[in-house]
C-alpha cells in the first residue's frame, strides 16, 4: 500500500451485501455487491499504481497541515501523462495548494515548459514554492500568481495554453471552466478535478449547492460542441475536455 494513502482505502471500503429474509444470499444482490467490492479494490489499486515519492509526500503532508485539498495520486498520474502527451509548454493551474498537482504537471511538461499557477492563499503558494525547490524546479519554469482566479484569468492570453487545470473553489467552477476554454489552443485539454464531488454528483437525490454546480458543469461540457469530453473516476473524479 502506498505510504500516506490510508484514507484512500478507507474511502473505498464497500458497504455490506444485501441479504434475503431467510439469511441466504440473494444471487442478484450478491453479484452487485461483489461487483462493487471489485470496483472499490480496482479504484484503490489504480490510485496506488504510480506511487508518490518523498517530494510529493512532503507536499501532501503540508496540505494536510494547512487544511488544503490536494489531488489524489491517481489524478496526479493522469495529469502527468496529459502534460507529457500534449508536450505542454504552457499550463495554467487554478488552485496551487501546496504544489502536489503542480509537481505532477511539471514532471510531465518539457524542460522549457512554464506552469502558471494561481491561488488566493499566499501561505499555500509559499508551501508550493518549498516543494518546487525540493523538486529542483528552476524559478523560470513557474509563475506563481497570488490573487483570485476570477481577477487573474481575464489577463491571460486567449488560445495560448496547452492545458488548464481547474481545482479550486467549486462555487466558481462555471466561470473557471469558461475562462479555461478561452485560454486553450485547439487540441488543448481542460481538466476539472473533483468532478464527482465525493460520489454526490452521481446521486440525483443530492441537490446541495456545490453538488448541483459541479453536476451542471459536467452536463454543460457534455453538450458543448466546442469540446470532446470524458469523465474519469480517478481520485474524486476528473472531467476532461479537449478543445476542438
Please report, for each region that a protein language model flagged, where it lies by residue.
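A short alpha-helical cap/connector motif
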Residues: 2-163, 170-191, 195-244
Amino acid at each position: 500500500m502506498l505510504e500516506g494513502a490510508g484514507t484512500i482505502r478507507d474511502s473505498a471500503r464497500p458497504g455490506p451485501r444485501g441479504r434475503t429474509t431467510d439469511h441466504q444470499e440473494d444471487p442478484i444482490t450478491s453479484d452487485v455487491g461483489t461487483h462493487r467490492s471489485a470496483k472499490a479494490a480496482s479504484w484503490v489499486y489504480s490510485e496506488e499504481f504510480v506511487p508518490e515519492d518523498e517530494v510529493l509526500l512532503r507536499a501532501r503532508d503540508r496540505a494536510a497541515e494547512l487544511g488544503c485539498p490536494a489531488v489524489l495520486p491517481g489524478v496526479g498520474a493522469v495529469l502527468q501523462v496529459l502534460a507529457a502527451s500534449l508536450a505542454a509548454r504552457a499550463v495554467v493551474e487554478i488552485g496551487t495548494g501546496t504544489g502536489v498537482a503542480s509537481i505532477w504537471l511539471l514532471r510531465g511538461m518539457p524542460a522549457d515548459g512554464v506552469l502558471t499557477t494561481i491561488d488566493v492563499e499566499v501561505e499555500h503558494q509559499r508551501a508550493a514554492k518549498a516543494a518546487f525547490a525540493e523538486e529542483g524546479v528552476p524559478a523560470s519554469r513557474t509563475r506563481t500568481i497570488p490573487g483570485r482566479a476570477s481577477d487573474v484569468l481575464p489577463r491571460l492570453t486567449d488560445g495560448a495554453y496547452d492545458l488548464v487545470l481547474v481545482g479550486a473553489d467549486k462555487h466558481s467552477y462555471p466561470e473557471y471552466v469558461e475562462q479555461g476554454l478561452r485560454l486553450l489552443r485547439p487540441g488543448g485539454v481542460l481538466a476539472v478535478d473533483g468532478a464527482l464531488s465525493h460520489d454526490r454528483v452521481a446521486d440525483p437525490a443530492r441537490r446541495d449547492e456545490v453538488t448541483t454546480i459541479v453536476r451542471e458543469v459536467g452536463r454543460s461540457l457534455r453538450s458543448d460542441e466546442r469540446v470532446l469530453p470524458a469523465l474519469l473516476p480517478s481520485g474524486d473524479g476528473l472531467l476532461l475536455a479537449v478543445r476542438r
